[in-house]
A protein has these predicted regions:
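Interfacial/capping segments of alpha-helical transmembrane domains
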Residues: 56, 107, 111-136
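Alpha-helical transmembrane segments and their helix-start/interface "positive-inside/aromatic belt" motifs
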Residues: 87-105
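Interfacial loop/helix-cap signal at membrane boundaries in integral membrane proteins
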Residues: 123-168, 191, 199-201, 206
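Short, highly charged, low-complexity non-transmembrane loops/tails of multi-pass membrane proteins
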Residues: 320-339
Length: 339
């Protein structure tokens, strides 16, 4: 085929490929294969022609776009954890503070009610649980509740259960926050009552070292899950410039991102509860010789608290000050401030 005829037959197609790129991966692959065929033909019969260089440039551009998209699939995970999630929390910092204060209030009510009437504890935690705990304390093994014959099975169960409870807290936001706040109320009262039992028995310091080795991640993650639920509620009640439906969908999307982040945190907390808390419990068990040093418990507790405060509070503020922000389309953008 003469070069002129070859160009006339394919020029419209090449122009289309060059000036109207497609986002459809199947279409992109088909275009690339077609161009490779055309390029092979051109190199065979018109090796020094300008049209050969033109086809090569179009094919190269498509190849680079395929490579870039493949690379972005991996960088997307990195961007999600390093920028998207922290900036998302910067957006909801006031809501996070409100949720934390509200949950703390519920815990305080649990403690105060227990001080005024110890029968309140049994009404919240149940007679069997309170009797078991008091029996363990009398036997010199106050934290025997954390001992398990099959720690791995317990680890899996607790991780799944905590994730499920957190998901219910998130979904509760759909009910104008009633479900979320009700879950916070129940968990706050239980925590306040449970913690008071040990303080009332003179085991306050020991209970902090044992319970909060895993509880720091677990409880604060439940607070964050409650925040995610209230994000949905906020989207329903305060749509701003968006329609209520669009605002609701955006709230759901943000809440699910938060939930994704919490799953690995719950897994770590469950690991701590079944292996580290167990060892800390042995530290204060009069009949056990194997336990974890007190300094190790303090270190784990401190690192857990530091991680939550840094990743969900301090780091988002730092990113915001550096000029990073989330655009309406969800993209991360760095705005360089003029000197």
């Amino acid at each position: 085929m003469r070069e002129g005829m070859f160009i006339k037959k394919n020029v419209d197609k090449w122009n289309e490929y060059q000036h109207n790129p497609t986002s459809d991966p199947d279409e992109t692959a088909e275009r690339f294969i077609t161009l490779v065929d055309d390029l092979s033909y051109a190199k065979t019969f018109y090796p020094r022609s300008k049209v050969t260089r033109w086809i090569n440039s179009i094919a190269s551009a498509i190849y680079l776009s395929i490579y870039k998209n493949k690379k972005e699939k991996y960088s997307r995970v990195f961007t999600f954890w390093k920028y998207e999630v922290p900036l998302l929390f910067k957006k909801y910092h006031r809501l996070l503070l409100f949720t934390f204060l509200l949950f703390s209030l519920f815990v305080g009510i649990g403690v105060f009610s227990s001080i005024k009437d110890e029968s309140f504890i049994r009404g919240i935690l149940g007679d069997s649980y309170v009797d078991m705990t008091e029996d363990n304390i009398s036997k010199g093994d106050p934290f025997g509740v954390y001992k398990s014959d099959n720690p791995f099975t317990n680890f899996v169960y607790i991780a799944m259960n905590n994730s499920f409870v957190a998901l219910l807290m998130v979904i509760g936001g759909v009910l104008i926050g009633i479900g979320t706040i009700w879950a916070m109320w129940n968990n706050g009262l239980m925590l306040g009552c449970f913690q008071y039992i040990f303080f009332a028995k003179g085991l306050g310091f020991q209970s902090i070292l044992v319970i909060w080795v895993h509880g720091t991640l677990e409880i604060l993650s439940l607070v964050i899950a409650s925040t995610a639920g209230l994000v949905i509620t906020q989207g329903i009640l305060f749509p701003g410039t968006y329609s209520r439906l669009v605002s609701f969908k955006r709230g759901i999307k943000d809440a699910m991102k938060i939930m994704i982040v919490l799953v690995p945190v719950f897994i770590i907390a469950s690991f701590f509860e079944n292996y580290v808390t167990y060892l800390m419990g042995n530290t204060f068990d009069k009949q056990s010789s194997g336990g974890l040093p007190v300094w190790a418990g303090i270190l784990i507790l401190t690192l857990s608290l530091s991680f939550i405060i840094w990743y969900f509070v301090i780091y988002p503020i730092q990113l915001h000050k550096e000029g990073y922000h989330i655009q309406k389309n969800g993209a991360i953008k760095l705005t360089v401030k003029p000197i």
